[in-house]
C-alpha cells in the first residue's frame, strides 16, 4: 500500500482497530447531547479520573452493521491531528445491549454498542450564546475566528471538507481553545475528482447558494460560506440568514448578496435548479449597507466570504492574512479568556423547554382555578322613614329614570363615561424610556452585542443570548437541517430552520457521497 505524502491523508487505509477496551472502563456522568444515531455523555475514566465525552453510535437503524457515516468520521478523525480539530481518543465497545437501548427496536443482527471517546470540551458556541447577558468582546471574536480558520485551513490542506460548519459544531474549552467537531458529514476530496457529491449537506442557515441551486461538484468554498455566516453572527448578535425552507433561504441570500446572474457568477444559469429558484426581480448587493456599523476591516473580510460565486470566495489561508486579524485590537490569547459554567446546547435547550413547560402549567392552573372576584359595591343606604331602598348610584343622563337632566358638557382634553370624568388629559411620554436605546450594537467597540462599553480586553463574556437550535459538536447526528440539538454532534430538535427536502434536520441520510 502506498504511503501518503507528508502532510496528506491516506484514506485508503482500513479503519482503525477498535474494541480493545470496554465502555465499563468509564462512568457516565451526564448526557450532554443526542442525535439521530447516537447520544453523547460526559464520562469519567474510572482508572485515571479523566473526564471525556462518550458518543454512542446507534446501531438499531443499521441492519447490516456499522453506519457508513461513522466509519467515514472515524477514518478522518484518526488522521487529523491539530490543536483546532477535536481529538478522537479511542473506540470502546459494550458487549451487550445497553440500558439506554432497553425497549427499543433492534434491526441489527450485530448486538452490543460502540462508543467513540473524545476529549471533553466545556462548551459549544451555541450553548454559550444561550447564556443571558453574555457577549463576546472584539478580541474574543478575533481569537475564535482565527482558531476556526486555522483548523479549517488544516482540513482543506489535507483535502477534507467539513460540510457542516455551524456554531454548535465549534467546541470551546475553559482554556479558550476552539476546535472543529462533528465530522459525520465530512469527506475527502481532490481537485481532479470527477464524481458527483451530495448537495444535502450543511445546516440550512449556513448552506451556500451553490448547494441550494443543486451543485454536485464543489470544494472548500462551501465551508468558507458557512464561516462567513458564523462571522457575521458573532458581529451581529444573531443569525443573519434564518430561512425556513430552501426557497426562503435563497431569497434571504439574494436580499443580502444580490441576485445571481452571468455577470456576477459566470455559469450560474446552468445550475440544475437555477430557473426554478431564481429571484423574481433583480436585487442589488446590500452587505455593506446592512452591516455598515461593522468595523471597516471586519466588513471587508465578511464581503470576501459572502461571495455568491464560489470561485471568487476567499479561502481560509487568505482570510488569516486579512487586515482584520492584524489591526488593533488584536486577537487575545485564548488562555486570557474567562471561564464559564459548562454550556452545552443540548442542556440549554432542555432548560428552555422546562421553563416553557412551567409557564404553560402556571397558565393552565390559573385558567382552571380563577381567583374569586370580590364585590366592591357599597352597602345599600336606607333613609329614615323610607320604605324602599334608594338607588345605589344616581341615574345617568340617558337613564330612563332621569328625564330632566341635560347631557353633560365634555370639556376638551377629558374623557367621560356615563357623565363622569375618567382620568386626566393625555400626558405625552407617560412612561420614561428605558433599556438600550441605541439598537444593541456597541459602536464604540465595534463588534459586541450591547451598547455598554466592553470589559477589559480578553475578559468579556461570549456573544449575546438568544434562541438557538441544534447541537452538533462531536458528531452525534448527521446534517442538522434546523439549528438545534446537542453538543458533540447531537441534534435534538430546537428551532433553527428546517430541511424542506429531508424532513427533520436530524434525518439520517445514510451514505453521503
Curated annotation (Swiss-Prot):
Q: Return the Polar residues bias intervals.
A: 434-448
Record-level GO BP terms? carpel development; flower development; mRNA processing; regulation of viral process; response to virus; response to water deprivation
Residues with Phosphothreonine modification: 198
Positions of the Protein kinase domain:
26-325
Provide a GO CC annotation, any one.
nuclear body
What is the tissue localization of expression for this protein? Highly expressed in flowers. Expressed in seedlings, roots, rosettes and stems.
Name the EC number(s).
2.7.11.22, 2.7.11.23
Q: What SUPFAM superfamilies does the record point to? A: Protein kinase-like (PK-like)
Q: Which family does it belong to?
A: Belongs to the protein kinase superfamily. CMGC Ser/Thr protein kinase family. CDC2/CDKX subfamily.
Q: What's the protein here called?
A: Cyclin-dependent kinase C-2
Organism, by scientific name, is Arabidopsis thaliana
Which gene holds the coding sequence for this protein?
A: CDKC-2
Amino acid at each position: 500500500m502506498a504511503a501518503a505524502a507528508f502532510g496528506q491523508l491516506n484514506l485508503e487505509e482500513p479503519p482503525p482497530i477498535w474494541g480493545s477496551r470496554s465502555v465499563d472502563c468509564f462512568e457516565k456522568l451526564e448526557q450532554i447531547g443526542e442525535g439521530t444515531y447516537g447520544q453523547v455523555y460526559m464520562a469519567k475514566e474510572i482508572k485515571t479520573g479523566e473526564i471525556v465525552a462518550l458518543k454512542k453510535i446507534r446501531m438499531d437503524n443499521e441492519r447490516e452493521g456499522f453506519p457508513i457515516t461513522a466509519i467515514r468520521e472515524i477514518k478522518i478523525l484518526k488522521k487529523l491531528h491539530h490543536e483546532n480539530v477535536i481529538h478522537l481518543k479511542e473506540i470502546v465497545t459494550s458487549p451487550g445491549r445497553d440500558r439506554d437501548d432497553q425497549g427499543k427496536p433492534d434491526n441489527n443482527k450485530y448486538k452490543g454498542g460502540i462508543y467513540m471517546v473524545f476529549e471533553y470540551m466545556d462548551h459549544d458556541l451555541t450553548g454559550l450564546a444561550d447564556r443571558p447577558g453574555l457577549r463576546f468582546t472584539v478580541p474574543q471574536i478575533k481569537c475564535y475566528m482565527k482558531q476556526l480558520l486555522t483548523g479549517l485551513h488544516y482540513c482543506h490542506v489535507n483535502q477534507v471538507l467539513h460540510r457542516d460548519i455551524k456554531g454548535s459544531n465549534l467546541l470551546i474549552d475553559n482554556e479558550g481553545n476552539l476546535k472543529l467537531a462533528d465530522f459525520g458529514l465530512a469527506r475527502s476530496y481532490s481537485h481532479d475528482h470527477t464524481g458527483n457529491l451530495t448537495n444535502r449537506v450543511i445546516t440550512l442557515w449556513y448552506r451556500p447558494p451553490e448547494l441550494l441551486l443543486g451543485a454536485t461538484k464543489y470544494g472548500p468554498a462551501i465551508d468558507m460560506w458557512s464561516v462567513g455566516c458564523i462571522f457575521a453572527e458573532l458581529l451581529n448578535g444573531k443569525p443573519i440568514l434564518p430561512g425556513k425552507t430552501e426557497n426562503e433561504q435563497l431569497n434571504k441570500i439574494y436580499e443580502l448578496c444580490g441576485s445571481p446572474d452571468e455577470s456576477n457568477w459566470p455559469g450560474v444559469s446552468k445550475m440544475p435548479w437555477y430557473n426554478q429558484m431564481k429571484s423574481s426581480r433583480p436585487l442589488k448587493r446590500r452587505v455593506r449597507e446592512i452591516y455598515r456599523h461593522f468595523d471597516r476591516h471586519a466588513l471587508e473580510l465578511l464581503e470576501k466570504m459572502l461571495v455568491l460565486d464560489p470561485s471568487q470566495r476567499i479561502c481560509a489561508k487568505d482570510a488569516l492574512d486579512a487586515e482584520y486579524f492584524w489591526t488593533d485590537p488584536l486577537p487575545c490569547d485564548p488562555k486570557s479568556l474567562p471561564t464559564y459554567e459548562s454550556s452545552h446546547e443540548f442542556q440549554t435547550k432542555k432548560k428552555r423547554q422546562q421553563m416553557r413547560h412551567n409557564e404553560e402549567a402556571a397558565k393552565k392552573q390559573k385558567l382552571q382555578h380563577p381567583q374569586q372576584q370580590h364585590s366592591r359595591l357599597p352597602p345599600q343606604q336606607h333613609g329614615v322613614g323610607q320604605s324602599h331602598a334608594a338607588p345605589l348610584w344616581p341615574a345617568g343622563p340617558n337613564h330612563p329614570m332621569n328625564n330632566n337632566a341635560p347631557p353633560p358638557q365634555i370639556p376638551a382634553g377629558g374623557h367621560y363615561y356615563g357623565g363622569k370624568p375618567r382620568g386626566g388629559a393625555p400626558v405625552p411620554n407617560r412612561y420614561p424610556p428605558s433599556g438600550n436605546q441605541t439598537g444593541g450594537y456597541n459602536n464604540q467597540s465595534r463588534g459586541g452585542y450591547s451598547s455598554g462599553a466592553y470589559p477589559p480586553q480578553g475578559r468579556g463574556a461570549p456573544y449575546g443570548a438568544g434562541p438557538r437550535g441544534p447541537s452538533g459538536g462531536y458528531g452525534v447526528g448527521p446534517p442538522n437541517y434546523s439549528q438545534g440539538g446537542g453538543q458533540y454532534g447531537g441534534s435534538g430538535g430546537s428551532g433553527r430552520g428546517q430541511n424542506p427536502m429531508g424532513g427533520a434536520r436530524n434525518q439520517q441520510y445514510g451514505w453521503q457521497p
